[in-house]
Amino acid sequence: MATRRPVTFVKTMLTGNATDSPKRTRDYFFSPATPAEVVNDCHHRLQPESTQALKDMMSPLHPERVTTPVAVLGAEHDWLVAPPKELAATARAYHTTAQTLPAGHDMMLDTAWQRAATAIETAITGHHAHR
């Protein structure tokens, strides 16, 4: 978000609030295919994010300290977290591959939620099968 929408990034970091309309909620969290009623319902439930939590998310990661398998899932319509190049770099850092789903940032609330759930289930059951 910082490089693609710097003003929104600064506003969010200062206030914890990035969405002031259902349109922004759709743009930030959902794919274009998500029904308006889902977007509107989620918009009305949103509350400001903790500014401390936002700062914590900016801390560097240490993949070399991670000893458990990691599933890296990204969303095709997610511009909040990681563009495809960064998603692939994250997967490489954790010695795995990234899977991109046809969804927005809130992939479990989007139209492709079943694909997201299946990807998570596959990662978990695959991990347990190799124990």
Predicted regions span which residues?
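Short alpha-helix in the alpha/beta-hydrolase fold that links the catalytic acid
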Residues: 58, 82-91
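Catalytic active-site module of serine/aspartate enzymes centered on a nucleophile-bearing elbow/loop
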Residues: 94-131
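Conserved alpha/beta-hydrolase catalytic His-Asp/Glu region
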Residues: 17-58
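Flexible "cap/lid" loop of the alpha/beta hydrolase fold
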Residues: 1-14, 53-60
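Acidic catalytic loop of the alpha/beta-hydrolase fold
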Residues: 76-81, 106
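Alpha-helical elements of Rossmann-like donor-binding domains used by nucleotide-donor carbohydrate transfer enzymes
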Residues: 41, 85, 89, 115, ...
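Short, conserved loop/helix-junction motifs that constitute active-site signature segments
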Residues: 63-67, 91-94
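Short beta-strand/loop motif that positions the catalytic acidic residue
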Residues: 66, 72-74, 78
